Amino acid sequence: RDCLLSRGLGDVYKRQFSNDEELAMSLMMAGDTAMDPVWRMPLDISFTKALKSNFADLANISDSRGAGACTAAAFLEEFVGDTPWAHLDIAGVANKSGKEKGSTGRPVPLLINFLKDQAE
């Protein structure tokens, strides 16, 4: 499913996970301004439930197929409490293959705009 989602979003959108609406919107607007867009992904209790373990308080990987990025975000969320946070999953946009092989530099334009906006 992660592979399908990466293909579905292509090399245009990066996935964003956040527990804070204002932070998520700030990142989305910074990305739009930089022409480096993000697509917000769900943080759902079902992904957290998939991290249950018989051997540890919390597993760091789900035993279910797919949704690896979603369960990874659920894992991160377990450690931040009420702190606003966001994770940009850049796996689908960080590199190009073929004749344009190499790093894209993304999400640097988004992050520069985001930090400028925060400084104002």
What are these regions (language model features)?
Residues 1, 6-120:
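A generic structural signal for tightly packed, nonpolar segments enriched in small/aliphatic residues
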